[in-house]
């Protein structure tokens, strides 16, 4: 008796159903996907179906046992994709992208972080696979070796296409121009599924890879015009206030502003920093702007005054580009440049990217004495790191531009008992609980570092810049964070938690006349601010930041996810909030006035990176200079 089509595909349908339900369960339990109405919930529920129907449906072209084996193999592969995204999301609050997958040189260093992020319940992801294997081996009813016909396959894939276009049409009606919002990965996953997002991400990757080949010097014109029109005059009174001094940048790992001037159980969390900012320029309204590249993104932003990419890390995707980074600019003023970081040189592709930035030296893990006794978590403890770095810095040619990158205050925030100077917090989040002791330890290490600079004679002739690189506590811990701060963590408050410390200390100047600067800004403004203090004119440079000390600086900054902040409003997740009250605004005109600027800045910066446009900049300046001289000669002749 001829078997019906449904009996032929019964094993496949069971696999699709199990994977569909599993994916929806992962959506609801592992990802924080905001749902506003029943339509969005329905879209979230059905969106995995078209992909699963397609990928499992390819088994219809196979015969016999190979069909079931393919289905089981695909179940394993799709499950791995789910698990990889779950683990990545637990720390980064984001979904994997293709550029992130190329960061394989980072994997060996993740060690304890990945172990901490895995949970026993993750084993439940294998239940459906076990069921399929059992059915394949034990149940003959699911071992059909009768091939499907051409008509059956045609009807099946026509149904798959109809499901896909129904999903896409519903999503477009709910969120118009959905596929133009490539920066909003949560929105894409919510509407087209995690799996279709990865396919879309692959298309984007191919498109962006072609941008460099198609770019030419004319591509820079719009960018130059925008940068020139939006550049603000620097603070003339402070221009050159730190001229000729050494620059010591300290990247404070995972340090957010909420710990500054805050206490835990009656004890200050950052006693040294609390005192240090009273002798410095303290910028209390500055936000980190990093994307998936985290610490490497912060380095990129600070050195280049460009935005990081929305997908992956620039340090991996575009390390071979030509840049106009701070080390290269300062080289013209006689500066020697160096990075000091007790980690592997290949981590975040730093060895290659630092060459592109123009750094003279990179002191990596091989420059340090690292032992089991002086290490914890991700590597060398901060106190040891600063102690050994000070010795290395004494031998640098002066003036120098240096960056020191700390490690101890890194997830999962491990700390030896003898280094614990403050008790852990008590909440349901072990991550937040352990965060405070590592921040306190980092603060103590900073105190010792400043003392060492004074002992070594490097303090008086330096400008010291301390900045937080990115968040340490993700929104996965908002319940515990709300408990600590004593308020609900709304989307507005979540943006406020992206504030990071920025402290500029100039001995002999800021200690005599300290300031608290409340101008809204981001890490992108650090380079222009620093260059002005050093007396370096950057009018000819392409940069999106402005001097934070300037009275003309616009109170505005945009985060990599498209959120933006002004002195009046905060925009995030499609909603506009009053900056003072944190309440949503019914009238969104105040946000609309800045929305285009936010999108344009991110887009233009992306064009520079993907097109490697700065390779044309020096030649373009020479061409423009020649044209000006030619015009002057013609004017004189006439």
UniProtKB/Swiss-Prot annotation:
Residues 26-41, 92-116, 175-638 are extracellular. CDD domains: LTA_synthase. Mn(2+) binds at residues 253, 295, 469-470. The active site is at residue 295. Residues 1-4, 63-70, 138-153 are cytoplasmic. Its main location: membrane. This is Lipoteichoic acid synthase-like YqgS. It comes from Bacillus subtilis (strain 168). The gene is yqgS.
